[in-house]
Swiss-Prot record:
Comp. bias intervals (Low complexity): 45-58, 286-298, 374-398, 455-470
Main location: mitochondrion
Name this protein carries in UniProt: Membrane-anchored lipid-binding protein YSP2
Gene name tied to this protein: YSP2
Segments traversing the membrane: 1278-1298
Compositional bias of kind Polar residues: 74-97, 471-485, 818-832
C-alpha cells in the first residue's frame, strides 16, 4: 500500500531537483551493480514492475511532437523471450531467452496517451491472478493517439475497466487454438503501411529492468539485459534511450526453428501442444492512419546487423470505435485512474513477411506514423526482420501479469521508446487542456482513407468472424469452408469513441458485452453466425467492422451510436446550444454534416436520410412523415409573395442549395441574437426559414429547413418586450428578436411548419375530436408552444357537407316544380326560417355594464327566426357574403353547426385604414350562443382578437348581439361593444376609439346586407322558377357549349398575392360554365375577336386556337393619355392553367406593350377565374398584377393606367358577352312561352302590377302611332335587369310626351303698349327697353318667326325696335339730330302712314348714326394734329 500511494503521488514529468541529483549519483555506479541493486529491491517487495509512460517534447517551431516512451515489464520463463538488455558490452547479448512453447510472454495493451497513472502500485502473487492464472500487473487506460486517428482496429482481447462508458467493437472473441493453418497474404496489398513493433513484457522476480525485447534466433542465444532501471521517470527514460542508441551496436538474434520456419512460409501459423496455453501471438498488419500520407519510412543502415535491437511495441487492441468532440475536449476524464482488470482466454498470433529490422537508432526517431495504434486483428509470430512497410505487432491483452513461476525465469524487461523519424506538425497541439476539437484537424492532409477490401475469390465464413456485408464486400464467392483468407486492411479516422466498462471476470465480461448488433435499418445482416464461436457476438457495431468495405474517398462523418451516447451531453462552448435528444434507441448510426447547408443524419453507407423521431426499443417509429420527395405538396391558405420578392430571395440564398421551385411567402424585419443583435430580414418560404443580414459588408446568413425544426416558441426580449421567437433544431437554437408583429409571424411559421411536417393530416384536421379540439395524442406536438390560438378549431366543419345541398332544387323536374309552386316556396322557406312567423314585441334580458357602449339599434323587416338563421344557420354563405361586404378577405371555413354546438371559431383578415400602424390585421373570432329562444330573444357574444395591431395581445373586443321581436312581426337588433384589457398600453384611448368606430361601421354594413338578402329572396325564387320553366329552351340556345349544362355552385382555388389587384369578383354571366368557355376560348374565335375589337382595339390578328393550352394574340390599342404615344402594339399570351368544367377553369393572360415608355420592363398578368354560380350560371373573377423586370420612374403611373385599362376592358368583355347571349336568346320564340308564364303567376302582386301597366301601354299606343311598338313589352322579362331598365325608360318618354302635348296651352299673353310699358296677362309693367331684355322675353316668338314661311310678316321684335328708335329721337338733343332723318320721320308722322318695311327704316337710322359718330371722331383727330409743333409737315401731309 505504501508503494501504491507513492505511485499515485508521483509526477509524470518527474523533473524534481532531488531526483536529478539521485540519478547523477547513480550514473557513477556500474551498470551491472545498479541492475542488481534494482533487482534486489524489486524482489524484496515481491511485486512486479509497473508499466509507465514518459514524455518528452521536441520543439521545432510550431511542429511540436510529443515523443513517447513506454516502459513495460516483461516476464520470462525458462524458455522465455529473449530481449536485449541494452548493456555496454557485447557480452550482454550472449544470453538470450527462448520463446517457450509452454509459457509464452503475454502481450500488453498500451495506451496511446502521453500520461497515464496506474491504479495499482504492485501486484501480489495470488490476488492479482484471474482464474486462468494470468497476473494483471498493469491496467492500461484506453485513449486516443491523436485527433486524426483513434482506436480503429478490431480487438481480440477484452478491454479494461475505465471510468468513461465507451462502446468498443471487437472483431473476434476468444478463439481456441486448433491445428488449422490460416494463411494470411499480407503482401498482397499495395497500400501496406509500416507495422509497429511489438512490446512484450517479461515480469521476473529476479530482474525488473525494462529491456528492449528482440527476436529470438534459432540458436536460442540468450542475451543478458543490463539496462539500468530508470525508476519510471521521464528523465530516466531519456537517458536510457540515449545510452542504448549510442553505446550499443545491434546484434542479430534469431527465433527458434519453428518460428523461423513459420516466417519462411510467409504467414503460415502453426499452433501446437508444445506451446504454453497462454502464449498467443496475434496476426495483423499494424498500419498507422498517418502512414498513407507520410509514405514509407527510411530504413536504417544497421537494420540487418542486430535483430535483437528491434523494439517490440505492445499495441493495445481495440475495436473500431469512434470518438466524439466532447470526449476530446475533456481529457480530464481520460486522465483519471483506471480500475478493474479484464482478462481473456485466448489470443491470436501475428506474422509478417519481411525480414529487415530497424536499428535502435532508427527506432529512436520513429515518425508518429509508427507510434502505437490500436488494433483488432489477430497476429502470428514475428519474423526476423521488420521493415517500415510491414511491421508486425503483437496483439494486445489486458492481462499484464503471469504466474509467479513464470516470473522466476524471466529476467528481461523491455523498454519501448517512441521517437519520430521526422518532425511533423502535431495533430493535437494543446493535448490535455480540455479544448481539443475534431474540427481543428478536419482539413488536415494527414487524414487517411480507409478501405477494407475482401478478396472476391477467397472470402470465407470463418467462425471467428461473422461477415456483415454492408458496402463493397463481394457477394459472389462466399464459401462456408475454412481456408485461406486474404485481407487487406487500412483504417480511416473515427469521429467518436465510446469506451465501455467491463467487469473483472470473464463470465461477467461476456454477459456485459453480449448485446444485440446495431446495424443500419436499410441493410440486412448477412452471413451472421450466432453460436458461441462467433467472434462478433459480444461486439456492438458502431460505424465500421473489419468486414465492411469503404471507399478511400469517404470522408470522416460517422460516429458510433451506443445506448449511452444520447444520454451524455457535451458542455464544451461550441455545443452549449445543441439540443440533446432524449435517450431513445436508434438503429442507425448517424452523424451531422457540419459543412452541409441542411442538416441530415448520415448512415453508415454514406447515404443521407432526414431525421426522424424515434420511440420504442430498437425500432424507429416515424412520428412525422418527412417525405422530402413529395414535389406535389402544396401549402393551403398561404399567400405567396410577388415574383420580384421571390427572385430576390433566391438571389440572397443561392449558395444554400435552394430548390428553384421554392416560393417565398413573406419577409419580415427582425434581428438575430448572437454576440450582438444582427439586424436583418427573415425570409419565410414553403420549405425554409432564412435570415440575411448585411451590416457594413459583414454578411450573416442562416438557412433553417422546416423539417429540421423541433420546437418553436415565443420569447420575451429583456423580460419586458414580447417580440422574440426561438427556433430549435436538433443541434442549434436560433433566437430572433425585434419583430414588429411577433404573433402574426409566429402563427405563420407554425402554420407552415405544421403543414410541412404533418402534411395532409394537418389539413384534414389531424387528431381532431368531434368538438373540433385537438386530441391528447396529437397535442403532444404543441405542448411546448405558449400560443393559445385555436387555429385547429377552424377546420372542424365536415368537408363532405355542401352548403348548397340544402337549398339546391336542380334535381326537381321543371314540370313538377311548376305544378307545385307553392310547395316549392314552402320548402325553400324552411331552410332559413325557424320559429313563428308572427309574434308580439319582446325585450331582451340584458343589462349593459359600465364598459358596454351602445353601438346601434336597428329594425329588420323579417321574423326573428329568419334573421337569426340567416346569420347563424347551417347555410354560412350568407354570413360569408356579409364578411366580404365588410372588405374582409382570407376568410377561414366557418362552422355550420353553431346553433347545435353553441360555439364557433373562425378567422379572417381585415384591412385597416389608419395612417400609422399595420395596413391589415388578422381577426380571430369566437362566437358563443348564450341565449336562444325564437319566441323571446337571442343573445350572441362575439370575442375578437387582433394580434397584429399594436398591443394586440393584451386586449380583446367583446360584442353582444341581441335579437328580439319588434312591431309588425319584425326583428329588433341591438349591439353593445366593449374592450377588455389584460395589460397596460399607452395607446389605450386610440385603440378603444378605433374599435368603437370600426364596430359601428361593420354593423351598419351587416344590417344593410341582411336587408338586401331578404329583399332579393323573392326575386331569386322567381328567377329560379323561371329558369326551371325555361330550361328546355335554354338547352337549345344557339350558342356553342361543352360540359354539363347543370351544376351546383363551386368556388375557384384562388389565393390572393401580395401585389394582386382584384378587378371584379362579383361578375355573373347567365349561361353555363361550358358556354362561357366556348365563347371566349373555344374553337369558334369570331366571338372573342369581336369583343377585342369593341375594346378600342384595331389591327386584330386572326385569333388562333389553343395549342397545348396556350395561344398568342396581337393587336393595336388606342391610348388616350395626355402624353406619350397615342397607340401601342399589344402582345397577349393566354394560357389555360386549370381546366375542370365540373369545378372551375382559370386562364392566365400576359400582356406586353413594347411601344409605351418602359414597355420592356413590365408586363400585365391577369388571371380570369370562371366557376359555377347559382341557377346554372357562371361566376367570373378577374385579378391583375403588374410584374416588373426592371426599374422605372413612371412605375406608379404605369400601374395605375394598366389597372384602369384592365378594368375597362373587363367591363366591355362582360357587356359584350351579355349582348351575345341576349341576341342568341332573342332568336328563339320565347315571347309566347314567357307570356304564359306571366299569366300563370297571377297570385304575385308584382305580376298583377305588370299586367296593369301593359294594359295602360296598349291604350296609349292606340292614340299615337309613335307608341305602336309598345307591344314589344310582351317579350321583355320584367324581373330581369333589362326589363326594369326598359320600364324606367318608358316612363321617362311618357313624361316628355305629355309635356310636349300640353305645353302650348300654358302660354302667357304679353303685349308692349309703348316703349317702356308692357302688358302681361292684363297687367301693365314699366321697363327700360334694351335688346337683352327684349330677346329674353320674346325668344320663343323669335324662334317661331324664323320657322314660319311668311318671314316678311312683322313680329313683335322688329316692331319694338322701331319704337325704341322713336323713343330715342323724342328724348334726344334736337341739335344733334340729323336733318335728313328728322325730316324723314316728320314726314312719316305727318302722313301717318305706316311704314311697310320697318327694317329698312331702322337700317337708315343706324347708318345715319354711324356717319355722325365717324364725323365726330375725324374732327377730334384733326384737332389733335393741329396742336403739334410740326404744323408744316402736317399741312404737307394733308
Amino acid at each position: 500500500m505504501r508503494d501504491e500511494a507513492t505511485r499515485k503521488k508521483r509526477s509524470f514529468s518527474d523533473g524534481h531537483f532531488f531526483k536529478k541529483l539521485k540519478l547523477m549519483s547513480r550514473k557513477k555506479q556500474p551498470v551491472m551493480e545498479r541492475s542488481k541493486t534494482t533487482r534486489t529491491r524489486k524482489e524484496s517487495t515481491n511485486s512486479a514492475a509497473k508499466s509507465s509512460l514518459s514524455l518528452r517534447r521536441a520543439n521545432n517551431g510550431r511542429k511540436t511532437i510529443a515523443k513517447r516512451r513506454v516502459l513495460t515489464d516483461i516476464g520470462s520463463t525458462n524458455e522465455g523471450v529473449a530481449g536485449n538488455s541494452g548493456s555496454n558490452s557485447p557480452a550482454q547479448y550472449s544470453h538470450t531467452p527462448h520463446f517457450s512453447d509452454s509459457i509464452p510472454p503475454l502481450p500488453l495493451e498500451l495506451p496511446d496517451i502521453v500520461s497515464i497513472r496506474s491504479s495499482r502500485s504492485h501486484i501480489s502473487n495470488k490476488s492479482n491472478k484471474n482464474k486462468h492464472g494470468i497476473d494483471l500487473t498493469f491496467i492500461p487506460r484506453r485513449s486516443l493517439q491523436n485527433s486524426k486517428a483513434g482506436l480503429k482496429k478490431p480487438n481480440t482481447s477484452p478491454q479494461g475497466y475505465f471510468n468513461i462508458p465507451v462502446t468498443i467493437d471487437r472483431a473476434s472473441e476468444k478463439v481456441k487454438h486448433t491445428d488449422t493453418k490460416n494463411t494470411f497474404n499480407s503482401s498482397s496489398s499495395e497500400n501496406e503501411r509500416p507495422v509497429l513493433s511489438i512490446l512484450q513484457k517479461d515480469d521476473s522476480q529476479s530482474s525488473s529492468h525494462p529491456a528492449i525485447d528482440s527476436m529470438s534466433a534459432p540458436n536460442n542465444i540468450n542475451n543478458n539485459n543490463d539496462i539500468e532501471n530508470s525508476s519510471n521517470s521521464l528523465f530516466d527514460t531519456i537517458l536510457s534511450i540515449a545510452h542504448s542508441a549510442i553505446s550499443h551496436v545491434p546484434k542479430i538474434s534469431a527465433l527458434n526453428t519453428e518460428i523461423q520456419r513459420e516466417f519462411s512460409h510467409s504467414g503460415e501459423s502453426h499452433t501446437g501442444s508444445t506451446r504454453h496455453p497462454y502464449f498467443h501471438i496475434h496476426h495483423a498488419q499494424q498500419q498507422h492512419p498517418l502512414s498513407q500520407q507520410q509514405g514509407p519510412l527510411p530504413v536504417s543502415e544497421n537494420a540487418n546487423q542486430n535483430p535483437n535491437d528491434t523494439v517490440l511495441i505492445h499495441s493495445p487492441s481495440a475495436n473500431t470505435a469512434h470518438r466524439s468532440s466532447s470526449f476530446l475536449r475533456h481529457l480530464d476524464y481520460l486522465l483519471s485512474p483506471t480500475s478493474g482488470p479484464a482478462s481473456d482466454k485466448h489470443t491470436q498470433v501475428e506474422e509478417g513477411d519481411d525480414e529487415e529490422e530497424l536499428s535502435p537508432l532508427s527506432k529512436a526517431f520513429l515518425s508518429p506514423s509508427t507510434q502505437l495504434v490500436p488494433t483488432n486483428t489477430s497476429t502470428t509470430p514475428l519474423s526476423g526482420s521488420l521493415t517500415p512497410n510491414n511491421r508486425n505487432v503483437n496483439a494486445n491483452s489486458n492481462s499484464e501479469t503471469e504466474n509467479d513461476n513464470d516470473r522466476d525465469d524471466r529476467s528481461n524487461v523491455g523498454k519501448v521508446k517512441f521517437q519520430p523519424l521526422k518532425v511533423h506538425e502535431p495533430a493535437i497541439s494543446t493535448f490535455g487542456k480540455g479544448n481539443l476539437t475534431l474540427e481543428a484537424v478536419a482539413g488536415s492532409s494527414d487524414i487517411d482513407n480507409t478501405t477494407i477490401d475482401l478478396d472476391e475469390n477467397n472470402t470465407n465464413n470463418n467462425p471467428n468472424a461473422s461477415s456483415t456485408n454492408l458496402s463493397h464486400i463481394s457477394k459472389s464467392n462466399v464459401n462456408n469452408n475454412l481456408g485461406p483468407k486474404e485481407l487487406n486492411t487500412s483504417y480511416r479516422n473515427s469521429t467518436y469513441i465510446d469506451m465501455a466498462r467491463f467487469e473483472n471476470s470473464q463470465s461477467n465480461l461476456s454477459s456485459h458485452r453480449a448485446r444485440s448488433k446495431t446495424l443500419p435499418a436499410n441493410k440486412a445482416l448477412e452471413n451472421a453466425v450466432g453460436d458461441e464461436g462467433n467472434s462478433k457476438r459480444n461486439s456492438r457495431y458502431s460505424s465500421y467492422s473489419n468486414d465492411m468495405a469503404f471507399d478511400d474517398a469517404d470522408e470522416r462523418k460517422f460516429r458510433s451510436m451506443s445506448k449511452k451516447f444520447l444520454n451524455r451531453r457535451s458542455f464544451s462552448p461550441s455545443n452549449l446550444g445543441n439540443k440533446v435528444i432524449p435517450g431513445i434507441n436508434l438503429r442507425n448510426s448517424f452523424n451531422k454534416n457540419r459543412n452541409s447547408s441542411s442538416d441530415f443524419f448520415s448512415t453508415n453507407q454514406g447515404q443521407q436520410m432526414p431525421r426522424t423521431s424515434t420511440a420504442g426499443s430498437g425500432n424507429i417509429h416515424a412520428i412525422m412523415g418527412l417525405d422530402s420527395g413529395n414535389d406535389d405538396f402544396k401549402l393551403e391558405g398561404i399567400e405567396y409573395a410577388s415574383e420580384k420578392k421571390n427572385s430576390e430571395f433566391h438571389t440572397l440564398f443561392k449558395d444554400c442549395d435552394i430548390n428553384p421551385n421554392e416560393k417565398l411567402i413573406v419577409d419580415h424585419s427582425c434581428a438575430l441574437s448572437r454576440d450582438i443583435l444582427l439586424q436583418g430580414r427573415m425570409y419565410i418560404s414553403d420549405a425554409h426559414i432564412g435570415f440575411f443580414s448585411n451590416i457594413l459588408g459583414w454578411v450573416s446568413t442562416v438557412f433553417i429547413p422546416f423539417k429540421e425544426i423541433v420546437q418553436i416558441e415565443k420569447k420575451t426580449t429583456a423580460g419586458i418586450f414580447p417580440n422574440g421567437i426561438v427556433i430549435d433544431t436538433l443541434h442549434t437554437k436560433y433566437i430572433f428578436a425585434s419583430f414588429m408583429s411577433r404573433d402574426a409571424t409566429f402563427d405563420l411559421i407554425t402554420d407552415v411548419w405544421n403543414q410541412i411536417i404533418l402534411g395532409k393530416k394537418y389539413r384534414n384536421g389531424f387528431g381532431n375530436n368531434d368538438d373540433g379540439t385537438i386530441s391528447d395524442s396529437s397535442s403532444a406536438f404543441f405542448d411546448d408552444s405558449d400560443d393559445n390560438d385555436d387555429d385547429g378549431d377552424l377546420d372542424d366543419d365536415d368537408p363532405d357537407i355542401n352548403s348548397t345541398d340544402m337549398t339546391s332544387s336542380d334535381d326537381i323536374d321543371a314540370d313538377v316544380f311548376n305544378e307545385s309552386n307553392d310547395l316549392g316556396k314552402n320548402q325553400k322557406s324552411t331552410n332559413y326560417l325557424l320559429g313563428p312567423n308572427k309574434h308580439s314585441p319582446t325585450t331582451a334580458d340584458f343589462k349593459p355594464s359600465n364598459n358596454d357602449h351602445l353601438v346601434i339599434e336597428a329594425n329588420i323587416n323579417a321574423p326573428l327566426g329568419k334573421v337569426v338563421n340567416l346569420l347563424y344557420g347551417e347555410d354560412v354563405s350568407y354570413y360569408e357574403r356579409i364578411l366580404k361586404a365588410q372588405k374582409n378577405f382570407e376568410i377561414s371555413p366557418i362552422p355550420n353547426n353553431f346553433l347545435t354546438k353553441k360555439i364557433r371559431d373562425y378567422a379572417y383578415t381585415k384591412p385597416l385604414s389608419g395612417s400609422i400602424g399595420p395596413s391589415k390585421t388578422k381577426c380571430l373570432i369566437t362566437d358563443t350562443l348564450e341565449h336562444y329562444d325564437l319566441e323571446d330573444y337571442v343573445k350572441v357574444l362575439s370575442i375578437t382578437k387582433n394580434p397584429d395591431v399594436p398591443s394586440g395581445n393584451i386586449f380583446s373586443v367583446k360584442t353582444v348581439f341581441l335579437f328580439s321581436w319588434d312591431k309588425n312581426n319584425s326583428t329588433k337588433l341591438t349591439v353593445y361593444n366593449s374592450v377588455d384589457w389584460t395589460g397596460k398600453s399607452w395607446i389605450k384611448s386610440m385603440i378603444e376609439k378605433g374599435t368603437f368606430d370600426g364596430v359601428a361601421d361593420t354593423t351598419k354594413i351587416m344590417i344593410s346586407e341582411i336587408k338586401k338578402i331578404l329583399s332579393d329572396e323573392d326575386s331569386n325564387i322567381n328567377s329560379k322558377h323561371q329558369a326551371s320553366n325555361n330550361e328546355s329552351e335554354e338547352e337549345i340556345i344557339n350558342l356553342p357549349t361543352i360540359g354539363p349544362p347543370v351544376h351546383d355552385p363551386t368556388e375557384p382555388d384562388f389565393q390572393k398575392g401580395k401585389d394582386d389587384t382584384v378587378i371584379d369578383e362579383k361578375i355573373n354571366i347567365p349561361v353555363p360554365l361550358g358556354t362561357v368557355f366556348s365563347l371566349l376560348y373555344g374553337d369558334d374565335t369570331s366571338y372573342i375577336k369581336k369583343i377585342i375589337e369593341n375594346q378600342n382595339n384595331f389591327n386584330v390578328c386572326d385569333i388562333p386556337k389553343f395549342v397545348n393550352n396556350a395561344r398568342e394574340i396581337t393587336y393595336t390599342k388606342k391610348l388616350n393619355n395626355s402624353f406619350g404615344p397615342k397607340q401601342t402594339k399589344c402582345i397577349v399570351t393566354e394560357t389555360i392553367e386549370h381546366m375542370d368544367l365540373n369545378s372551375f377553369f382559370m386562364v392566365k393572360q400576359i400582356v406586353r406593350s413594347p411601344d409605351v415608355p418602359y414597355g420592356s420592363s413590365f408586363s400585365v398578368h391577369t388571371r380570369f377565374f370562371y366557376s359555377w354560380g347559382d341557377h346554372n350560371t357562371t361566376n367570373m373573377k378577374v385579378v391583375t398584377n403588374v410584374v416588373w423586370t426592371g426599374k422605372s420612374m413612371l412605375k406608379g403611373t404605369i400601374e395605375k393606367g394598366s389597372i384602369d385599362g384592365q378594368r375597362s376592358s373587363t367591363k366591355q368583355l362582360v357587356d359584350d358577352l351579355k349582348k351575345i347571349i341576349s341576341n342568341a336568346s332573342s332568336t328563339k320564340k320565347k315571347s309566347r312561352r314567357r307570356g304564359k308564364t306571366v299569366n300563370k303567376r297571377k297570385s304575385s302582386p308584382s305580376t298583377i302590377k305588370n299586367e296593369k301597366n301593359e294594359e295602360n301601354f296598349e291604350d296609349t299606343s292606340t292614340k299615337n302611332s309613335f307608341f305602336s311598338a309598345f307591344s314589344m313589352l310582351q317579350q321583355v322579362n320584367i324581373t330581369s335587369v333589362q326589363g326594369i331598365m326598359t320600364i324606367i325608360s318608358f316612363f321617362i318618354c311618357l313624361i316628355f310626351f305629355f309635356r310636349l302635348l300640353f305645353h302650348s296651352k300654358n302660354t302667357s299673353n304679353i303685349q308692349i303698349i309703348t316703349p317702356g310699358t308692357i302688358l302681361i296677362n292684363g297687367n301693365e309693367y314699366n321697363y327700360v327697353p334694351n335688346f337683352k331684355t327684349l330677346y329674353h322675353v320674346y325668344e320663343d316668338n323669335i324662334i317661331k318667326d324664323a320657322r314660319r314661311k311668311d318671314s316678311n310678316k312683322n313680329n313683335i321684335v322688329t316692331d319694338t325696335e322701331g319704337l325704341i328708335w322713336d323713343w330715342l329721337i323724342d328724348r334726344g338733343n334736337g341739335t344733334v339730330q340729323n336733318s335728313v332723318l328728322s325730316n324723314h320721320i316728320k314726314e312719316s308722322n305727318n302722313k301717318k302712314v305706316k311704314l311697310v318695311n320697318g327694317v329698312s327704316d331702322h337700317k337708315i337710322q343706324q347708318l345715319v348714326e354711324s356717319i355722325k359718330i365717324t364725323e365726330l371722331q375725324l374732327q377730334e383727330m384733326k384737332e389733335l394734329l393741329a396742336q403739334t409743333d410740326n404744323t408744316s409737315a402736317t399741312n404737307q401731309l394733308l
